[in-house]
């Protein structure tokens, strides 16, 4: 594994001072050093904001974590059909694929930023930081660490589980941990993060920050993904139901407003982009400039039923003369300050629908109502509950609904791999080995203890 320098944290902290005015007053950047970041509460808070900024880059939610799985799901194209993108669609990913490397490297950079906070904030003297802020900062870092490991374990399977800070001179030779070990740490971190406040001092402080409800929502998703192995569907259903009932989140009538308006009632955790930290994916989705990515056309449109309000927002043609369809969820280009909703209530309804059905052994009124809620917002009629004669039929319907609801959000590929639906509905090579991406070759050269995934 490539070593992750403490200067990654310092760079992120410096950016947080220039662009996170809502969270803290700025300190002269020249006064920030790796040694003094954790000497004061303000310094620790700046490290937390820097950690959030690790999620915004082109190798994270600013592009890779969304667009790469969408290539795997065969939802998008690249204007030049570069092999490093096309290989995801054809399940022929090379071990030196740069986007696989980028996801791995950016993931461990974010984890290192979180580890620094968890370990070093815990070690700060009592006089340097208030007790409530110490707990808050650590729990925020635990959430980001859990979110990042969840993304990595879905992409690569077994990954090294590193929970202490690493420095520029560290020569790590860390083997891969089992999937079960990684999930256990994700769950432990999220259980602790669920103790975060649901509302901070004011709205400005709450926007973009992890809350207790965000941790519970992500934990429900984690339990759903891990449920086939650990039978945690009851926990997934319970947490999803709790978030639906108590978070105050709701689905706006206008589906498109979730992306054209920042921090709507639908959002549970939303990454904040601004003029200093613009959204790379929105920038390269602009059909009036140099769009790099565009949507598959008819194959995507045909997934939606007649009258589905989501279709014409999710994909669109820029002009009648332009045959391409574009990604509608990232259309705020000038400037590209569009936020990214990482967790939203519509997904939680669908998590509840599936988990509750699995728990009940078949579709029930509770699971059906959650499924119907999402379809009602889309303006389409839901088949009668009696039409779902088997559990499998209902789960497939829920997953297909999630695919339409969360198109171009980086979710459908992982969700379909989770149940095997990807084999028939997405994959060019119907081989479960290719549910996972290859461990980057550069990482294996640097760290010979890393094994490669089957099929690569």
PLM region spans:
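Membrane-proximal, proline-rich intrinsically disordered regions
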Residues: 3, 20-67, 93-96, 424-456
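Short, surface-exposed recognition loops and adjoining beta-strand edges that mediate ligand/DNA contacts
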Residues: 34-35, 62-81, 162, 198-283, ...
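Conserved, well-structured interaction surfaces
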Residues: 45, 53, 83-156, 194-202, ...
């Amino acid at each position: 594994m490539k070593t992750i320098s403490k200067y990654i944290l310092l760079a992120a902290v410096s950016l947080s001072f220039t662009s996170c005015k809502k969270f803290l007053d700025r300190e002269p950047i020249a006064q920030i050093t790796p040694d003094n970041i954790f000497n004061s509460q303000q310094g620790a808070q700046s490290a937390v904001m820097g950690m959030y900024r690790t999620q915004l880059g082109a190798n994270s939610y600013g592009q890779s974590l969304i667009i790469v799985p969408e290539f795997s799901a065969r939802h998008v194209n690249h204007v030049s059909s570069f092999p490093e993108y096309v290989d995801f669609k054809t399940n022929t990913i090379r071990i030196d694929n740069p986007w696989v490397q980028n996801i791995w490297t950016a993931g461990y950079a974010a984890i290192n930023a979180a580890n620094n906070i968890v370990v070093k904030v815990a070690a700060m003297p009592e006089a340097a930081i208030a007790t409530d802020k110490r707990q808050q900062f650590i729990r925020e870092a635990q959430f980001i660490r859990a979110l990042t490991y969840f993304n990595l374990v879905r992409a690569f399977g077994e990954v090294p589980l590193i929970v202490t800070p690493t420095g520029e001179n560290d020569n790590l030779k860390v083997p891969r941990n089992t999937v079960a070990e990684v999930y256990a740490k994700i769950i432990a971190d999220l259980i602790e993060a669920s103790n975060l406040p649901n509302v901070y001092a004011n709205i400005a402080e709450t926007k973009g920050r992890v809350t207790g409800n965000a941790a519970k929502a992500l934990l429900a998703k984690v339990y759903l993904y891990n449920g086939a192995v650990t039978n945690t569907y009851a926990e997934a259903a319970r947490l999803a139901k709790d978030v639906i009932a108590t978070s105050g989140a709701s689905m706006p009538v206008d589906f498109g407003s979730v992306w054209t308006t920042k921090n709507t009632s639908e959002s549970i955790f939303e990454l904040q982009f601004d003029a200093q930290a613009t959204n790379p994916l929105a920038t390269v989705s602009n059909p009036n400039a140099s769009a790099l990515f565009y949507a598959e056309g008819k194959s995507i449109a045909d997934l939606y039923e007649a009258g589905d309000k989501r279709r014409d927002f999710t994909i669109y043609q820029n002009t009648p003369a332009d045959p391409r369809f574009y990604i509608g969820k990232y259309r705020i280009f000038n400037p590209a300050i569009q936020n990214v909703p990482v967790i939203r209530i519509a997904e939680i309804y669908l998590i509840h629908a599936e988990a509750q059905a699995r728990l009940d052994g078949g579709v029930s009124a509770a699971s059906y109502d959650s499924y119907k809620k999402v379809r009602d917002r889309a303006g389409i009629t839901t088949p009668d509950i009696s039409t779902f004669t088997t559990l499998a039929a209902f789960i497939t319907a829920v997953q297909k609904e999630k695919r339409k609801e969360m198109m171009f959000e980086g979710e459908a590929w992982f969700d379909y791999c989770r149940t095997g639906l990807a084999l028939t509905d997405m994959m060019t090579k119907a081989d479960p080995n290719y549910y996972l991406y290859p461990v980057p070759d550069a990482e294996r050269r640097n760290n010979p203890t890393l094994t490669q995934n089957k099929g690569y």
